[in-house]
Amino acid sequence: MCYRQETMSGLLDGIPEAVALRCLAHVPLHLHPNLELVSRSWRAAIRSHELFRVRKELRSSEHLLCVCAFDPENIWQVYSPNCDRWLTLPLLPSRIRHLAHFGAVTTAGMLFVLGGGSDAVSPVTGDHDGTFATDQVWSYDFVQRQWTPRASMLVPRAMFACCVLQGKIVVAGGFTTCRKSISGAEMYDPENDVWTSIPDLHQTHNSACSGLVVNGKVHVLHKGLSTVQVLESVKLGWDVKDYGWPQGPMVVVEDVLYVMSHGLVFKQEGDTWKMVASASEFKRRIGMAMTSLSDEVLIVGGVIGPDRLNWDIKPLSDVDALTVGNDRPAWRSVAPMTRCRGTILGCTQLTI
């Protein structure tokens, strides 16, 4: 207590510390590095968890988008819609070159990067790096602005489902080090830095899987399959459902499921799907991410593949947004990524 008073005292002359913190809580995250230069006490305040607790209390938290692309390797950028600009995080200090096929989620105000393997190729032999799947876990603390290694997963995995359920991270399925598909699942408690086993998936498939949370339940989807494996609670385990969902990238916006299929964006309404917008302009994109930020669907990065007239592959830094809450949703361009471009390897929303 004495240390905090000493380092954060005198934030604003003549104003109590608690009031000064409430003033600082309204300053956007992208301006924090500038505020740190004012004084030691301001730096201590900006890098305190107390400030972010006050931000949450005052409902001044920001919704940000965290993105990692193939180029440059192991670099994450963060997009702020409030100022329409991108910030670059410090390099992920993983020993693995070109980390890919990992899981990425946010919880407890931090970004977590889990598992995955190397997508690096030797320029001499053309061979891939030997690391296919790892158990490593990293977290990025936006208060301290640093990466920290966390407790390793119980099983190395890549191309797996990764979600947050009630503040805890759930990973399931994917492939392990011998490139064998696995049904195992586990849960991570970020507060205690502990992994525990949870019931296995009922089915394994020789394809990559992904996960999303719909109506408070984890849904694991395997590419090319109509069946979905659903987890509502660890005690109940997994259920296998066949919802007949359209094939294509999916995202949840304000508890509503959206899917991009056959050049169109559809919205789930009960047992039916309503078309909300055309997405034909994205048909040629490969490796893009479809994600959500506040009340918008975002299309991020990717590459334009070769065609009959042009054999070049063009990596993109473009970002397009669709405000689905409007009566007439329309696409608009937002600030492109300033460092990242090409195939999107990780993409997740952060509230802080």
Curated annotation (Swiss-Prot):
Matches recorded under SUPFAM superfamilies: Kelch motif
Pathway, per record: Protein modification; protein ubiquitination
GO BP terms: protein ubiquitination
Residue ranges constituting the F-box domain according to the UniProt record: 9-55
Kelch-type repeats, residues: 57-109, 110-167, 168-215, 243-293, 296-351
Keywords annotated in UniProt: Kelch repeat, Repeat, Ubl conjugation pathway
A Pfam family: F-box
Domain note: The F-box is necessary for the interaction with ASK proteins.
Subunit annotation: Part of a SCF (ASK-cullin-F-box) protein ligase complex. Interacts with SKP1A/ASK1.
PANTHER family membership: F-BOX_KELCH-REPEAT PROTEIN SKIP30 ISOFORM X2 (PTHR46344:SF21), OS02G0202900 PROTEIN (PTHR46344)
Role noted for this protein: Component of SCF(ASK-cullin-F-box) E3 ubiquitin ligase complexes, which may mediate the ubiquitination and subsequent proteasomal degradation of target proteins.
Name the UniProt record assigns to this protein: F-box/kelch-repeat protein SKIP30
Native organism: Arabidopsis thaliana
Gene (UniProt): SKIP30
